[in-house]
């Protein structure tokens, strides 16, 4: 089983961004946490990050994964192109946000991408990724039986 984690713009700057909102952990810490989880669970995982919409769409279009966790970053709020690419992806998928987007500025409260995902986890910090990975792993393994 292969799971894909996609991180959008500015997530590579974790640890340097507003620590009151995003915490003290770095992007490398996040990747390490995800890779450790994958190793403990016997799952192959790829962590992909891009600040460019087209690169994210191209990665999704490869369709070479069994489950998806995506943090579209700011693209969450307006990228109908990523939304359409997600709609093509027919595997379990969860949108994740480190901060609680529903408790922040008005423009951050709308997600155009969540409606084409199985669900959304928001505001649980880096732990939200683990919850999302657990879900996509479980649902992917059940659907492959």
From Swiss-Prot:
<keyword id="KW-0456">Lyase</keyword>
<keyword id="KW-0028">Amino-acid biosynthesis</keyword>
<comment type="function">
    <text>Catalyzes a trans-dehydration via an enolate intermediate.</text>
</comment>
<feature type="active site" description="Proton acceptor">
    <location>
        <position position="22"/>
    </location>
</feature>
<dbReference type="GO" id="GO:0008652">
    <property type="term" value="P:amino acid biosynthetic process"/>
</dbReference>
<dbReference type="InterPro" id="IPR036441">
    <property type="entry name" value="DHquinase_II_sf"/>
</dbReference>
<comment type="subunit">
    <text>Homododecamer.</text>
</comment>
<keyword id="KW-0057">Aromatic amino acid biosynthesis</keyword>
<dbReference type="InterPro" id="IPR018509">
    <property type="entry name" value="DHquinase_II_CS"/>
</dbReference>
<dbReference type="Pfam" id="PF01220">
    <property type="entry name" value="DHquinase_II"/>
</dbReference>
<protein>
    <recommendedName>
        <fullName>3-dehydroquinate dehydratase</fullName>
        <ecNumber>4.2.1.10</ecNumber>
    </recommendedName>
</protein>
<feature type="site" description="Transition state stabilizer">
    <location>
        <position position="17"/>
    </location>
</feature>
<comment type="similarity">
    <text>Belongs to the type-II 3-dehydroquinase family.</text>
</comment>
<dbReference type="GO" id="GO:0003855">
    <property type="term" value="F:3-dehydroquinate dehydratase activity"/>
</dbReference>
<feature type="binding site">
    <location>
        <begin position="98"/>
        <end position="99"/>
    </location>
    <ligand>
        <name>substrate</name>
    </ligand>
</feature>
<feature type="binding site">
    <location>
        <position position="108"/>
    </location>
    <ligand>
        <name>substrate</name>
    </ligand>
</feature>
<comment type="pathway">
    <text>Metabolic intermediate biosynthesis; chorismate biosynthesis; chorismate from D-erythrose 4-phosphate and phosphoenolpyruvate: step 3/7.</text>
</comment>
<feature type="binding site">
    <location>
        <position position="84"/>
    </location>
    <ligand>
        <name>substrate</name>
    </ligand>
</feature>
<dbReference type="GO" id="GO:0009423">
    <property type="term" value="P:chorismate biosynthetic process"/>
</dbReference>
<feature type="binding site">
    <location>
        <position position="71"/>
    </location>
    <ligand>
        <name>substrate</name>
    </ligand>
</feature>
<dbReference type="InterPro" id="IPR001874">
    <property type="entry name" value="DHquinase_II"/>
</dbReference>
<dbReference type="GO" id="GO:0019631">
    <property type="term" value="P:quinate catabolic process"/>
</dbReference>
<dbReference type="GO" id="GO:0009073">
    <property type="term" value="P:aromatic amino acid family biosynthetic process"/>
</dbReference>
<feature type="binding site">
    <location>
        <position position="77"/>
    </location>
    <ligand>
        <name>substrate</name>
    </ligand>
</feature>
<feature type="active site" description="Proton donor">
    <location>
        <position position="97"/>
    </location>
</feature>
């Amino acid at each position: 089983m292969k799971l894909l984690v996609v991180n959008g713009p500015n997530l590579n700057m974790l640890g340097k961004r507003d620590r009151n909102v995003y915490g003290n952990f770095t992007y490398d810490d996040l990747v390490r946490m995800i890779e450790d989880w994958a190793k403990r669970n016997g799952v192959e995982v790829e962590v992909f990050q891009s600040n460019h919409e087209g690169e994210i769409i191209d990665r999704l279009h490869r369709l070479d994964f069994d489950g998806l966790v995506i943090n579209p970053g700011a693209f969450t709020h307006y990228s109908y192109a990523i939304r359409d690419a997600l709609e093509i992806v027919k595997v379990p998928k969860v949108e994740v946000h480190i901060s609680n987007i529903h408790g922040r500025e008005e423009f951050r409260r709308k997600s155009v991408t969540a409606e084409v995902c199985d669900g959304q986890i928001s505001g649980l910090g880096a732990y939200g990724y683990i919850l999302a990975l657990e879900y996509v792993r479980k649902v992917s393994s059940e659907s492959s039986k």
